[in-house]
């Protein structure tokens, strides 16, 4: 039923407000109105983690690919080198999944104190309502270029 959830999230016509409160990786991130679904607002709690995949998953995948490649070539994989590579990959991914790292790269609208979540939710709903009900007056004069 994952495809139904993704279709619903993509086509929904109500405000999309996302709060990363724990770990959010890969397809699950999309399915729960992550950045790819252009939510109206997206915030993170300080302990939240987000990314394409976790460091552990990424390093495990790379290790499996390297072992399979070595076996295809008829070579014994260098497990010591793979362990070092695994640690390096985990370190890089882990440093980039932190809420402050991702927020600093504008992948959300800010890191919020969990105690303020209800207040922020109310403010964002008011903002969305105002956007929907605001009338804009067209520009009635030309724009001079200098």
What is the predicted function of each stretch?
Residues 1-146:
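Ligand-binding clefts of soluble mixed alpha/beta catalytic domains
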């Amino acid at each position: 039923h994952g495809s139904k959830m993704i279709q619903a999230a993509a086509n929904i016509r109500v405000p999309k407000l996302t709060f990363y409160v724990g770990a959010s990786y890969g397809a699950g991130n999309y399915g729960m109105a992550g950045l790819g679904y252009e939510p109206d607002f997206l915030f993170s709690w300080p302990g939240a983690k987000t990314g394409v995949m976790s460091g552990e998953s990424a390093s495990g995948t790379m290790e499996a690919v390297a072992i399979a490649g070595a076996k295809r070539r008829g070579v014994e994989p260098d497990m010591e080198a793979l362990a070092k590579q695994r640690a390096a990959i985990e370190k890089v991914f882990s440093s980039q999944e932190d809420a402050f790292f991702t927020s600093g790269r504008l992948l959300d609208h800010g890191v919020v104190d969990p105690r303020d979540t209800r207040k922020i939710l109310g403010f964002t709903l008011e903002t969305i309502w105002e956007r929907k009900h605001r009338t804009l007056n067209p520009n009635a004069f030309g724009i001079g270029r200098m």
